[in-house]
Amino acid sequence: MSRSGAMDLASGLGGKITKDEVKSAVDEYEKYHGYYGGKEEARKSNYTDMVNKYYDLATSFYEYGWGESFHFAHRWNGESLRESIKRHEHFLALQLGVKPGMKVLDVGCGIGGPLREIAKFSLASVTGLNNNEYQITRGKELNRVAGVSGTCDFVKADFMKMPFSDNTFDAVYAIEATCHAPDPVGCYKEIYRVLKPGQCFAVYEWCITDHYEPNNATHKRIKDEIELGNGLPDIRSTQQCLQAAKDAGFEVIWDKDLAEDSPVPWYLPLDPSRFSLSSFRLTTVGRAITRTMVKALEYVGLAPQGSERVSNFLEKAAEGLVEGGKKEIFTPMYFFLVRKPISE
């Protein structure tokens, strides 16, 4: 980790949480999760607090490791991680038929990496919906630097209660974000409401697959690790997600777990048995260096108390993701394209 990289990471740790409150925020966040004895009901009923704490605590680590787009991707042999991430975003825009001048909504947009890429790729106007103040502040600055403030903006709101009029958007997408929703039907109904009739919604969902066995202790541990390290109330099955879209009123055009035929495993950047210079910060060695540096920064007071514990639960998530991917019980890219009927 370079000195500038270390300082950039340290300066953002904790997001909008004050430096003195980071440790207690970590305590509260961890207690929500099954890995520490927390209950699914508490995670769902307190999802706004849980998810906001998660992204305040984790965003700087994400940006340091992933760049501006916090998601996995279907990947071809010979393709870099960055190239695959961009193509994964372009695929959504193409499936939605996004064209110049269209109004598009990115649900759960993070710091806006995908919305900036899709806006530049399609020449559409993209609004990012996010309920985390720190991520929106960071995203607006990145929009300014990229010169896209005229076509890309952010709205701070809960995707379960969107502040938009009915039939506002020409297209809506979500990239590994609606997995945070406590109720998928309620979330998809809001998306349905703000989408214009005859237009489409495309999504990459985090899901457990048909290979997941709920009574298998190893499978349950992996699921708990992923939920802990990624701020999730519960990981739903692919069937549950697709049925939720139908229950919200959508017509299904097509669906597929894109991880099934990805020539390069989606979890490769996190796999301790592999090494890649192109994604070094995500590798086991890279993460170990980051963890050591965060510990040192915390020790000398440049990073808030509790930062090392955030690094630790993100490391636990990485282990769960790799194991879940190898056992084929988890996918971060269950894709479906659905349409709002022209006449309801």
From Swiss-Prot:
One Pfam family it belongs to: Methyltransf_11
GO-annotated cellular components: endoplasmic reticulum
Enzyme class: transferase
InterPro entries named among the record's database cross-references: Erg6_SMT_methyltransf (IPR050447), Methyltransf_11 (IPR013216), MeTrfase_SMT (IPR030384), SAM-dependent_MTases_sf (IPR029063), Sterol_MeTrfase_C (IPR013705)
EC number(s) given by UniProt: 2.1.1.41
Alphabetical UniProt keywords: Lipid biosynthesis, Lipid metabolism, Methyltransferase, S-adenosyl-L-methionine, Steroid biosynthesis, Steroid metabolism, Sterol biosynthesis, Sterol metabolism, Transferase
Coiled-coil residue spans: none
Single biological process term from Gene Ontology: methylation
Annotated pathway: Steroid biosynthesis; sterol biosynthesis
Reactions performed catalytically: zymosterol + S-adenosyl-L-methionine = fecosterol + S-adenosyl-L-homocysteine + H(+)
GO MF annotation list: sterol 24-C-methyltransferase activity
Similarity comment: Belongs to the class I-like SAM-binding methyltransferase superfamily. Erg6/SMT family.
UniProt-listed PANTHER family: HYPOTHETICAL LOC100005854, ZGC:194242
Protein name stated in the entry: Cycloartenol-C-24-methyltransferase 1
Source taxonomy: Eukaryota, Viridiplantae, Streptophyta, Embryophyta, Tracheophyta
